[in-house]
UniProtKB/Swiss-Prot annotation:
Record organism: Buchnera aphidicola subsp. Acyrthosiphon pisum (strain APS)
Record carries keyword Magnesium: yes
Catalytic residues identified in the record: D8
Protein name: Putative phosphatase BU028/BU029
One Pfam family matching this protein: Hydrolase_3
Stated family: Belongs to the HAD-like hydrolase superfamily. Cof family.
Length: 272
């Protein structure tokens, strides 16, 4: 019997306008009342996810920065895995002067960027956090949970991905959350590890976990869950990597909520 529902946010639970629809909110509320545990698993900063959680007025587990930080139902940090300081220092410098690529950093409760080119459209629209500018020589590289590079020049990002993988190997995990956003976290602990930790904490088998995602940064979580679905709007590479998974409706068509309703609520329509 499924007890844990793990859901990615951008491209999965959230619409393209970064909103949660009324229908999705209703389904989540019903399942919370039915004693299901929700896990919001995202590349976003913890503060961003907390604001989404608070808007729903529910208690959930949080996996933030692609697994670097994990929080329990009481909003307490129960796991943390930051990037190696030397690696973080080099990554912050590698494309700092490239005007086509924005270097972005999550450190503790802060969000730093090297420049804000409006045409990249990957900054303030995706976050409720306020970013600050950073200079590599002035930044302390401790407690950096994630570094990510955003650009409209996808070819440059793919070249950068190969360069980072070739240089650092399994010391880091490098993947795209969306085509124009290349994310780097510690190589040891990802969303899948976070789901394992939470399931173990609750005494729930991974077989009783259900997961939803749309990006390559969701792949390991989708693999470890007992049941997993990918979105119609998913990254084509994810569909190729996990061809056995069922594809559900898109994030703009309440794909997650419709699937959950079909599985858990459809026989009790009077509840809706």
């Amino acid at each position: 019997m499924y007890r844990i529902i793990a859901v990615d946010l951008d491209g999965t639970l959230l619409t393209s306008e970064n909103k949660i629809t009324k229908y999705t909110k209703e389904i989540i509320q019903i399942l919370i009342q039915k004693k299901f545990y929700f896990v919001f698993a995202s590349g976003r900063h913890y503060i961003d996810i907390m604001k989404i959680k608070d808007s729903l007025k529910i208690n959930i587990f949080i996996i933030s920065s692609n697994g670097s930080k994990i929080y329990n139902l009481d909003n307490n940090l129960i796991f943390s895995d930051n990037l190696d300081e030397n690696i973080a220092s080099k990554l912050c410098r590698i494309k700092y002067s490239d005007k086509e690529i924005i270097t972005q950093v999550y450190q503790n409760d802060q969000w730093y960027i090297n420049n804000n080119k409006v045409e990249n459209n990957f900054c303030s629209l995706l976050s409720s956090l306020q970013y600050k500018y950073f200079y590599p020589d002035d930044l302390n590289f401790k407690n950096i949970s994630k570094i990510f590079f955003t650009s409209r020049n996808f070819q440059k990002l793919h070249i950068l991905k190969r360069k980072i993988i070739n240089f650092y190997g399994n010391k880091v995990h490098v993947n795209f959350s969306i085509p124009g956003c290349l994310e780097i976290v510690s190589g040891d602990h990802l969303k899948g590890y976070g789901l394992k930790l939470i399931a173990n904490l609750l005494g729930v088998s991974l077989k009783n976990c259900i997961a939803f995602g749309d990006g390559m940064n969701d792949q390991d979580m989708l693999k470890v869950a007992g049941k997993a679905y990918i979105m119609k709007n998913s990254d084509p590479h994810l569909k190729i990597a996990l061809p056995h998974l069922e594809i559900i409706e898109s994030n703009d068509n309440d794909g997650v909520a419709r699937c959950l309703n079909k599985i858990f609520i459809e026989n009790n329509k009077e509840m809706l």
